[in-house]
């Protein structure tokens, strides 16, 4: 209820004669600005208002410019959620007569539509790098990522280095060093 919405003066209860709030420029309103929406980009009255799926309101010209200047990373200017031309909904309201057609200045805002929900059946992408299911087993402070590491589940690491390269030599040295450290720790635990 903190967002600005249509004025309460347009409701049937407040439009009765005899009350000062019955007029559109009543004392309770700040210059008639309560009947408008504010764009989250230009912070002005929203022209050709659209709302994103994450719930933020913008002018269509402002949002169109935002999307055009960032074609590779289209995110909501407020919360950084994914946003695109297809993921905004136009807002229509009473008293919007006399507006200029937005197609003359920028491409038209998208039509209102209800997209079908995505069907993600089961464990789609399990272990194939799709960002699907990831598991890890553990007891107390000792995590056992045996299955996750052995089967390369959801692992985004690059392939191992080619034998004979300096990177391969460094990796082998570190591997032997950590093996030696692990053996020393295990030996210390046995004699302690």
Swiss-Prot record:
Main localization, broad class: mitochondrion
Chain segments carrying region Required for ubiquitin ligase activity and protection against ER stress-induced cell death: 29-80
Keyword Lipid biosynthesis: no
GO biological process: autophagy; defense response to virus; ERAD pathway; innate immune response; positive regulation of ERAD pathway; positive regulation of type I interferon-mediated signaling pathway; protein autoubiquitination; protein K27-linked ubiquitination
Keyword Membrane: yes
Intervals, Mitochondrial intermembrane compartment: 152-171
Membrane-spanning intervals of the chain: 131-151, 172-192
Pfam families xref list: zf-C3HC4
Membrane association type: Multi-pass membrane protein
Residues covered by region (Disordered): 1-30, 90-123
Subcellular location per the Swiss-Prot or TrEMBL entry: Mitochondrion outer membrane; Endoplasmic reticulum membrane
Residue numbers on the Cytoplasmic membrane side: 1-130
CC annotations in GO: endoplasmic reticulum; endoplasmic reticulum membrane; mitochondrial outer membrane
ZnF (RING-type) intervals: 39-80
Domain of life: Eukaryota
SMART domains hit by this protein: RING
Catalyzed reactions: S-ubiquitinyl-[E2 ubiquitin-conjugating enzyme]-L-cysteine + [acceptor protein]-L-lysine = [E2 ubiquitin-conjugating enzyme]-L-cysteine + N(6)-ubiquitinyl-[acceptor protein]-L-lysine
InterPro entries to which the protein is assigned, alphabetical: RNF5/RNF185-like, Znf_C3HC4_RING-type, Znf_RING, Znf_RING/FYVE/PHD, Znf_RING_CS
Pathway: Protein modification; protein ubiquitination
Alphabetically ordered keywords of this record: Autophagy, Endoplasmic reticulum, Immunity, Innate immunity, Membrane, Metal-binding, Mitochondrion, Mitochondrion outer membrane, Transferase, Transmembrane, Transmembrane helix, Ubl conjugation pathway, Zinc, Zinc-finger
Enzyme nomenclature, EC number: 2.3.2.27
Top EC class, one word: transferase
Function, as annotated: E3 ubiquitin-protein ligase that regulates selective mitochondrial autophagy by mediating 'Lys-63'-linked polyubiquitination of BNIP1. Acts in the endoplasmic reticulum (ER)-associated degradation (ERAD) pathway, which targets misfolded proteins that accumulate in the endoplasmic reticulum (ER) for ubiquitination and subsequent proteasome-mediated degradation. Protects cells from ER stress-induced apoptosis. Responsible for the cotranslational ubiquitination and degradation of CFTR in the ERAD pathway.
Domain comment in the entry: The RING-type zinc finger domain is responsible for E3 ubiquitin ligase activity.
Protein's recorded name: E3 ubiquitin-protein ligase RNF185
Organism: Pongo abelii (Sumatran orangutan)
Organismal lineage: Eukaryota, Metazoa, Chordata, Craniata, Vertebrata
């Amino acid at each position: 209820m903190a967002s600005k919405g249509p004025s309460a003066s347009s409701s049937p209860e407040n439009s009765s004669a005899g009350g000062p709030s019955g007029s559109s420029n009543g004392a309770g309103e700040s210059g008639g600005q309560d009947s408008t929406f504010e764009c989250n980009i230009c912070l002005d009255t929203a022209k050709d208002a659209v709302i994103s799926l994450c719930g933020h309101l913008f002018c269509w010209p402002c949002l169109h410019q935002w999307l055009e200047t960032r074609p590779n990373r289209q995110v909501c200017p407020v919360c950084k959620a994914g946003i695109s031309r297809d993921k905004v909904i136009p807002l229509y309201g009473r008293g919007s007569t006399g507006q200029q057609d937005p197609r003359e200045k920028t491409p038209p805002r998208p039509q209102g539509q209800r997209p079908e929900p995505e069907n993600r059946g089961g464990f789609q992408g399990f272990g194939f790098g799709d960002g699907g299911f990831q598991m890890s087993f553990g007891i107390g402070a000792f995590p056992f990522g045996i299955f996750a590491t052995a089967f390369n589940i959801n692992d985004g690491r690059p392939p191992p280095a080619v034998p004979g390269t300096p990177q391969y030599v460094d990796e082998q040295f570190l591997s032997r060093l950590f093996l030696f450290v692990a053996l020393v720790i295990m030996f210390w635990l046995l004699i302690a």
